[in-house]
Amino acid sequence: GKPKPETLKVSVGYQAGWIGEGEISYAGAHAVERAKLAGEIIHKRIGDHFDEFRVDYIGLSSLHGESLSQGSSSYEVRLRIAAKSKNQALAQLVGEEVEALYTNGPAGGSGARKYLSEVIGVVSILMNRDQIHPHIQVFKS
């Protein structure tokens, strides 16, 4: 056989930031237009503060983007805004801003929800074999 490799591949988890989300529904006449206006409002207010910022219109463009839904009209649509940041408080702001659309956004918004999720990243690295010491511990519940 071959000699053991000097390095071993190790997957390392690390704290990779936060994702803040907010959702709100619009229904009835001009639901799509109101949802798009709400998305524009949030994007203008906070969009530039994030590493990643996404606006989806669930029921209209959340799966295939807007290329396949252009010109279509929907009686109801759910606005979803998600953004990623290294700062937890900033990520939490996304949901707060969407929730504020109840009183400070287009008429008829309902069912607002907000979420905050920690992002755990994974990266593979090579470590010297002599730095790795296997250890097994069994916990009983």
Labelled PLM ranges:
Residues G1-S141:
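C-terminal non-catalytic interaction/assembly regions of soluble proteins
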